[in-house]
Amino acid sequence: SDFSLFNLGIPYLYPGNTQEIIDYGLLAIAMSRFSGAWVGMKMVTDVCDGGGTMEADPDLPAIRFPGGYQKYTDPRLVPPITLALENEVNIRRLEAVRQFARLNGVNRQNNAAARVGILSTGKTYYDLMQALRDLNIRDGIRIGKIGMPFPLEAEFAKQFAEGLETILVVEEKRSFLEMQLREILYDQPAHPAILGKSHFPPIGELDPDKIAKVLSDVLGIKDRRSVPSPQSPAPKPQGARPAAFCSGCPHNRSTLLLEGQIAGGGIGCHTMAMRLNDPSRAISFLTQMGGEGAPWIGMTPFVDHPHIFQNIGDGTLFHSGYLAIEACVAAKVNITYKILYNGHVAMTGGQAAMGALPIPELTRKLQAEGVRKTVVLAENVEQYSDLSVFASNAELRSREELPRTLRELPSIPGVTVIIYDQECAAEKRRKRSRGQLAEPTMRLVINEEVCEGCGDCVRQANCMSLTPVATELGQKIRIHQSSCNKDYTCAMGDCPSFVSVQTKSGTGLKKNSLPKLPPADVPAPRQMVKAGDGYRILGPGIGGTGVVTINALLATAAWIDGLSVATLDQTGTAQKGGAVVSHLLLSEQPIEAPAKVNAANADLILGFDLLGVVHPGNLNTACAERTVAIINSDVVPTIDNIRNRAPVSGPGQMLELVNSVTNRGRNIFLDANRLAEGLFGTHMAVNLFMMGVAYQAGLIPISLDAVEQAIEWNGVDIERNLQTFSWGRKYYEDAAFVESVAVPNRDRKEAVPFDRVSELREYQNEAYAQEYADFLEKITEPSLKETVAKYLYKLMAYKDEYEVARLLTKPSFERGVRDMWASAESVSYNLHPPMLRRFGVTKKLKLGAWFRTPLLVLKNMKMLRGTPFDLFGYAAHRRMERSLIQWYRDLIEQVQTNLTPENLPQALEIAALPDQIRGYEKIKEVNVAKVKQQAVEKLAALKAAQAGLLVVGS
């Protein structure tokens, strides 16, 4: 930006905080009107994404205008008049700008008598001030703040340099101020030494810590800062929290391709499909906004691939994407545009796209532009009652027809279009919470005993609400109900475990009837910290859960109390479930520091997300003598955990890491997700609940009245939010009481002892269970016996039609479903019976509550299993499942024969191989083939190792 504006001859101002955005903005407007020049403003992320208290006096800034300058312009852009215009733009106007800046004090200095001066600008100036504060440097240095980096005002620069021996220029990126300063001072007598890029890198951004290090070197002083040095290694099982498509996001499904197909990426939420490393979303290139599909025009003559898909969001389409489509039509290339029509510009706040057309009108426009065929894939086909409004070459289909459409359109020469019509999931959720959209009454529940943990539902839905859980029966998938967005795509997984629950309209998850906490029930905090000249709060959390809202509530409350406030919300793609970090600076004095918490400067870490807390950049803000941590100890799965079906590691190592760099004795760790969902029925209450805990601990220097007023001003679910805050305060005072009130989290069922022998008795009969027990008696090594007990059971209790019927009608499951919902009216079963597949039934059938009776009948027919009357048992798949039982017994007997203390770990690996035999039908068959191959290789290695030991021993 600096050099672009410089080359264009455009003066610009550089605000470093919220106050300066207003002040400099007004100055820039006045400067432009006075001089006739375009005047720019340099805005950086840390300023734009921040906020704070400011002086809103309409008479400030007091703007003065120099005299003696007359603007000149001439519309005749031909020589020799252009010479006069060049003089106007590059000389007269810039000189007028300098005079204006000088008269209005746009650049300022502290006029200290000193040998060393430091010059800086914008956001970096406030980083400099924080660095000086961290180094405890209060005076003896002349500080200059440049409000207008270009053109650098020469008179100010000369006055600033007077009497100095050294000037350190603190600026980001390439030398710019330093370059201008050298040019101004070069011919001055006894000019000072100028340092800058000799000490600061020309890339990346500067922060107070980098600046403090350079100041220590230049000034020859000791760095007195206390920077944390963790005593424990950083936990390796978890990485950073990447952004992901929201639960129920249409892009989870719309970006899918068939095998061998490729797509181009573009600008929008759908770009995140690139980081999934998923062959079924094979994105080959990424373009600028509005260039979607254009690279294919140039690539087509040089590649053998005959066709490509191109993803494009509706916001981009209506902004500039039409041009690329028109170019592809003109170039006669074979391309299918996937217009991802979700009705909102979701990546940047959910606003409506400017110039948006209704889908029927859009199909007509595309036809007029030369598009050969358009297929509209709609979530709700019934909304289009009059098909005549669509273009004649357009066809309306259900979104379930995506695979068919992906097969058909590449065969049509030229440009074709898929319009995937499904509203943004985040906006749906927001509308539902505000009562602007009806809440669906159908919910899905996974029967975890039927679930095989194969992850096919995850492959279908790519949904953040499908969380992996470790159970006694192995890894399973569970729907996190309070974050589920009711998209239902997961039920397309090839698995009979999904049960549809029809709830009464206006009801949902069963909520605890909480007694209201009167103010007298929670005393005022016994001791409260003071804001003083700077109290800093760091809030790492998960995007979309209200972290930014908490920061805004606290900032508002502090303003009500008369404190100075500065905030920064580092969000990035946080709205999509990625990491978000909020920074809050409270002070009893005017703030001249960045809102961003730097190394060893956090007073409170309000850790809404443990993964975010242990990120090195966030841990670096802690100081063992200063920082108190209030941490949500629950580890929420990342999209990588979910896609890879990897259970989340426990919090132990990460919490110990937090303790090692903070005030261990004052820290509070709590499973806030379990408590919030137990108390309020939703994970969205977590952050406000934790804010209440921190407040009652005396760690938020704001009055109770101000906090409650800020919650009221927010205007959303006021009474419940006040109660959430109060219950968090109550938890600090009496954790045991709050724990006793919170209902057990419905998504975290307590483990109960699992009796495999009894289950096999229910599965078949006493003899079958005894057969299992007898085989286990043959195994003497305890750990091997424990492993075989798990996986022999898994293979013996294979889930045929009789067993699925038994598990779906199991009283404990049916009771759990009823207890989960405030008003469950009926249950339906989503089944794709193998027998019907042979007759061409290609998708699941939704069978209503009436089907429970046939399931009970089928369950009681288990005595037919394995007999000549078992019609299901004749299927090749069932024969394979039965054969696995004897295969595994033979495998274990061979392992036992070759077992030694030395090869026990390898033996346990072999015994646990059936854990990988997951899924139903084709999915299971593929896994069986892989496991059998592994068994052959591992058993051969075990025998070879045993043979080697015998040779050595002899």
Tell where the protein language model's regions lie, with residue ranges.
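Structured alpha-helical segments in the cores of large, soluble enzyme domains
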Residues: 1-5, 99-100, 124-128, 153-154, ...
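Active-site cofactor/cluster-binding pocket
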Residues: 360, 365, 500-539, 545-777, ...
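Flexible, low-complexity linker and terminal segments
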Residues: 15-245, 250-251, 259, 267, ...
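Glycine-rich, anion-gripping cofactor-binding loops and their flanking helix/strand elements
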Residues: 103-187, 278-296, 319-321, 351-359, ...
